[in-house]
Amino acid sequence: MGFDIDSQKICSDLESSDRRLKTTVLDELLDKCKEATNSESADKIADVFDKLYLHLLKCYEDRFESVRSKAIQVVSAFLSSLPPTDFHLMNVVSTLAERMGKAETVEPSEEIRLLYIAQLNLMICLYEKMENVGVFRECYPLVVKILIKSIKDDYPVVQREGCSAVVTLSRLADTQEFRPFTESILLPLYTMLNHKHAQARISAIQAIARLSLHMDASGDAMRRLFNEVSPLLMDTMPLVRREVGQMGILMLMELLDRYSFFERILPLVLCCLKDESPEVLNHIYPQWLKCGIQYFNENEAELSQQEISDLPVENYPKDVKRPTIGCRGLVQRSLRLLQLITRETSDWKDNVRLHALKLLYQFVLHAEAAMTAKFFEIYGDLAHACIDHVAEVNAEAAKVADLMGRLLSYDAWIDHGFDGLERNARESYMRCFYHMFTASLGGTYEQLMRLAKLLRCTDYSHTLKPGFQHYILKLLNTIVDKTLKINAGQNELEDLYESVYVCAIKVMALSSSLENVGDEDVNFGQTLIEKMVKLLNTSVPKIHERWFHLALQDVINLDAALEDNAEPVMLLNGLINMCHIRATYVHDLIEKVKIVFQHCCDSAQVKIFSSLSLATLFWSKTMNVERESSTQMLSEFVSQIVEPYLTWKAGSNAEAMRSLAMATLCALAQGAESESVEVLPSLAKYMPSLLEDRNVTTRHYAIKAVVYFREMSVEDLKPLAYATMQRMDDPSAGIRILAALAMGKLKPKFAETDTEENYEKEVWDAIVKRAMDLLLLYHESPEKDMRAAVAVTLKVLAKSHPEAWEERYQRALPMAQKKDLLTELYDKLTINEDSHTEVTSASQD
């Protein structure tokens, strides 16, 4: 079908006030135009459009929305069918500017505003095909007004179409001609960066990226551009972050003055290389390699020489691909940005700190040893980031420190690292140094010794911070591991291990004394000591005996009114709990404890005494000396630590100390059973009063200790026996039962001469009879446990004193309230005795 129309009739119909007529005409015209695209010549279509375009453009202002919409579609159809020409350009653009380029919103319909900006985009694309046709530049003021209005539109689709038009225009515009308009377009685009729709933010970034290639780089506009776009590197949507990286790639490849802005462009790309989303990394990384190739080609003379001597890094991190020499060169010329990056690691926003550390990681990865000179500048900020309260942030800081330890020149940074530790005895510097030092391959004997001595000093090893303690132990473990790779004599290694041991045992002691802290650090320290034991070919007890006294010497400032939570008290308490009491340092330990008892507060005294009482349970296991020496040391310990507190004194603290002294004595009797036989008799004079003490705990430990008073004469044991019998009437049921059991375990040592022996036996028989009377009395007790304890003791006494048992039974039987129970007990004990006699006779036969 031909494109034959009655142009005059169409023009007349378009001027009609009948909406239906105009829409019908426009529909027919649109259909014919679409059909003519493939069947009619361009000249024919152009001839028709020349006759109609003024009336069509006039319809843009029609009061009916449907007419305006159809008119725009018809004009766009004609423009699409026509060859590239600027004949109608000014008229169409002017009309669009009237409808879309004013400050106020002239066109109320969102859909028609979208058609307007789509038509402008179409015309820009057509202009691109016209190559060097200069009429369009005359339209820049009008076009820019339309674009700005579209970007500010409330309708997101219109905004995105406007951004698309900006991108298209930026691709074909001449920089010198278009530059005056860039800043006015950028302003609404910056506002659009905060749009709630991710797709709108992406469109804005694309437009800004293209406009940046035309900007005047000499002013503040470029600085503002980076400030506005950079926050989107932390956008929640991966596609937005990817677009920011794409903008960086575009500027690295095409920006004329890119060398001046490498420091600001690189973060846009490097952050995407550390992005957690694969779709960001996989899109940006190949293009980043192209940037490196371009930079290498532009600086081939310099980089080719560097490439020749570019050896593989020995300690490169696993699963990390080394950047190309071109990419590394790009970053190495932009190290001035590090100060800005490290400053952001202290920002109040969590995501900003994390973003800065990820960026710093990429800088270290690309700069490698060239970054060594900047280490001292960023050491403090990175150290602070290592103790960030957000786990994800401090984990990223640890990765950066690890990478720095691997890639930076060890000999150049190690002295700065030590200097930071010496000046700043804080957990932050410790963590940072640990990650760097552990990851590095360096470490001489002198450096390891210097580090071990530094950690041994009170500023480090006496800390009460659990996190600090943990990293001290980890750094000590690193020192031990690195000793396997150094050249040092056995004596030198032993000196080094000595410092490591002393530091480790102090940290473990303090860690064990802290409340609400697990055993993780203590267990880790034990593993560390066991590792040293293997290297020294010795045992854990021997290493304690050899070096523990050095740790004890570091417990200072005890001569003050310290509470139980004071660091010196906690250290001494932890040391006692960790290693107990050993022969090599028992004298030093006694002196330290005496100072505590003399000067420290009540709570501190009680705490130390409690630990001592537990430690004495292991006396026979930890005292690796002959029995005679062990007995002598036990006697000294008891006389100086325990005995002074067995006598009664007024006051709550004195009462607590008396209880603990009795507990310690009881523990010693169990832990040093053979040695206590010789030591305890001298303390028998205190026992009667202790057995009658007002404090139930004191009486409890006293009655438990009574049975360990052995090898004593009848005269010395007699007061203990009667005091023990009195405890069978104690208010505490537990003490009554223990007293009943204790009477069967008291064994005197009789005199060697017959006369004295007979006399002492008579005295002891009287004591036994008295005990039997009491036991028979308590056998009628309603307490089941008490009756059982009485039966056990009577069985022992009846066996050793049968005549006395028979006599006391006959005496008690008439007075017994429950004769059947007493008779049953008598029969049971007598049967046992008879059966025992028969078995003995049979064995003799």
From Swiss-Prot:
Enumerate the subcellular locations listed in this protein's record, separating them with semicolons: Cytoplasm; Dynein axonemal particle
Q: Which Gene3D superfamilies match?
A: Leucine-rich Repeat Variant
* KW NADP (keyword) present: no
Spell out the residue ranges that the record assigns to HEAT repeats.
47-84, 138-175, 180-217, 260-297, 332-369, 523-561, 674-715, 766-803
Q: Name one GO biological process term.
A: outer dynein arm assembly
Short name of one Pfam family for this protein? HEAT_DAAF5
Going by the UniProt record, its keywords in alphabetical order are: Cilium biogenesis/degradation, Cytoplasm, Repeat
Q: Does the keyword Chaperone apply?
A: no
| Tissue specificity of this protein | Expressed in testis.
Q: Which GO terms describe its molecular function?
A: dynein intermediate chain binding
Q: Which GO terms describe its cellular component?
A: cytoplasm; dynein axonemal particle
Effect of a null allele: Homozygous deletion-mutant flies are not viable. The larvae are smaller but do not display obvious morphological phenotype. RNAi-mediated knockdown in sensory neurons affects flies movement coordination and impairs hearing. Testis-specific RNAi-mediated knockdown does not alter spermatogenesis and in particular the formation of sperm axonemes but it impairs sperm motility.
- What is this protein's function? Cytoplasmic protein involved in the delivery of the dynein machinery to the motile cilium. It is required for the assembly of the axonemal dynein inner and outer arms, two structures attached to the peripheral outer doublet A microtubule of the axoneme, that play a crucial role in cilium motility.
Into which family does the record put it? Belongs to the DNAAF5 family.
Q: Which PANTHER family match?
A: DYNEIN ASSEMBLY FACTOR 5, AXONEMAL, DYNEIN AXONEMAL ASSEMBLY FACTOR 5
This protein's name: Dynein axonemal assembly factor 5
Q: Which species is this record about?
A: Drosophila melanogaster (Fruit fly)
